[in-house]
Amino acid sequence: MNRTVTQSPPAGMGQRISQWVGLADDESRAPQMPWRFAILGTALVCAILSVYRWYQQTHSFNVGLDYFEEDFQIYWMRLFYVQMTLITLAGMIGVPLIWFTRPANPTMTARQELRLYYLILGFAAVASVVVVAALGLFVEADAAWHQVTVRDTDFTPTHIALFYFVIPAGLVGGVLGFIWLHTRVPYFSHRVSMPLGIMVAGFILIMPNLGFNEWGHTFFYAEELFAAPIHWGFVFLGWALFAIGGFVTQLIIRIIELTRVDSPATTSSAF
C-alpha cells in the first residue's frame, strides 16, 4: 500500500531569520517570551553604542574642538548628515506606511495577542538598554564635555551623538511604536495608552527644549552647570520615561486576563 507523504514547503528567508532570532511562532506550545530576540537585540544595540563611543573617544579631542576646521566637517558633520538623513527617512516612510496599511477593524486570537505582548516586552528590554546607555554614556559625557571645552556652535561631538542620534532615533522609534500599537492591537485600538503617550511626548518635547538650551547658552548662560535652571526642562521631560511602569502595568493586566482559565478574556479599558 502506497502512502502519500506531504512535505511542508521549505522555509523562506524571512521565516528562517525569524526562527534564528527567536520570533518564529510554534503553535504546538504556549507563547513564550522571545528571550533570544531580547538578548540579540540588546547585544546589537550595545555594539552600535560602543562603536559610537569609541569613535567619540578617538576623534573628539583631535578633530572635534573647532567646528570651522576642515577635519571637523569630515569626521563629524558628515556623520551628522548621514545619521539625520537616515533617521528622518525612517520617520517619513514608517509613519505613513504604518498608518495607511492599518486594518479597519483589527482582530486577533487570544494566543496571538498574548504572543504580541511578549514581543512588546522583548522590545522594551532592548529599549531599556538604550535609555541606560544614553544617560550613562552620552548625557553625562555631553555635560562634562562642555565644562572643559569651548562651545563654538550647537554642533559638538557630544551633541551630534546625543541630540542628533540617540534622542531622535528614540523619538522616531517611539512614534512608530505608538502608532503601530494603536492601529494593530485590538486592546488599544479604541483607546489611548496614556503612559506610552507620556513617554513619546517626553522624547518629542526634548527637541524644542534643546533649542531653548542652546539659545540660552549662546546669549546669557555660557557656563555649563549640571543643575543650572536652563537644564531643568531636560530633567522634567526625562522623568517621562518613568511612565513605562504604567505601560508595563497595562500589559500585565491584559496578560492576566488572557491567561485566566476560569473566564474568557474580555476587552477592558486601558487606564
Language-model region placement:
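C-terminal transmembrane-bundle signature of multipass membrane proteins
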Residues: 47, 194-271
